[in-house]
Structure formats: C-alpha cells, structure tokens
C-alpha cells in the first residue's frame, strides 16, 4: 500500500509528515522553508511510495478561510500540474497548532529536566503529524 504525505502549509515554514506503508501511524518527517517545498516534495515523491497528499484547510471559527488559503490553492495547482496522478485531500486544521504548542510546552519541560537535545521539537512537523493522524483515523 502507498504512503500518505501530509503538509501543514505556512508562509515561512511547512511541516511534513508521512504514514507507514499500512497507513496506520503518522510520523513527523521534516520542516522546510516554504521556498524549498517543491524541491523537497520532489525528493520525497521520488524515494517514497506516496499516492496521496493531505493538506491542511485553514478554517476560522466562523467557517471562513484564512487568507493563506489563496497561497495553498496556488500550491495545490502546482502539485496537480506536476504530479497529476497524486490524490490531494484537505482536512480541517483548526486546533492543530494549539495541540502542537501544548505538546511542545510539556515535552520541553521534561526534556529540560533531562537535559536532552531539543532538535526534534518542531511545531510545524508536529502539526503535520497531528493532521495526518486525524486523517488516517477515519
């Protein structure tokens, strides 16, 4: 079975996550500068068996869309043109950043107590992982 890649799109940074081959678990993959996303996407699509990309849908509490949705739509158009066989799915991303921040706060406290490396603590990658885990749950 092919894997699913998830994108948490931001103006400056983009978080990426990926499922295992049986699509049961989401793993944080990377955080990239938004200027490098096409090259990074190409790299993962070349070396991983991915047939679906899940992209967060930035919805406000009143159900209107955040302005960044215009950039996301342009990005999706680029993906569709370059990779027409890829399936693109959207998922409501409300609360994922808050959940990621909560996770980071709690994890940093524990890590600081243990004096370990904090490089793996990345809100964008964690947000993408939360989004993807929500997607594969259903």
Curated annotation (Swiss-Prot):
Main location: cytoplasm
Keywords: Cytoplasm, Hydrolase, Nuclease, Ribosome biogenesis
Any one GO molecular function term: nuclease activity
Family: Belongs to the YqgF nuclease family.
GO BP: rRNA 5'-end processing
GO cellular component term, pick one: cytosol
Coiled coil location: none
Entry annotated with the keyword Cytoplasm: yes
Locations listed in the record: Cytoplasm
Protein EC: 3.1.-.-
Function: Could be a nuclease involved in processing of the 5'-end of pre-16S rRNA.
Top EC group: hydrolase
InterPro entries on file: RNaseH-like_sf, YqgF, YqgF/RNaseH-like_dom, YqgF/RNaseH-like_dom_sf
Source superkingdom: Bacteria
Protein name: Putative pre-16S rRNA nuclease
Matching SUPFAM superfamilies: Ribonuclease H-like
HAMAP family found in the cross-reference section: Nuclease_YqgF
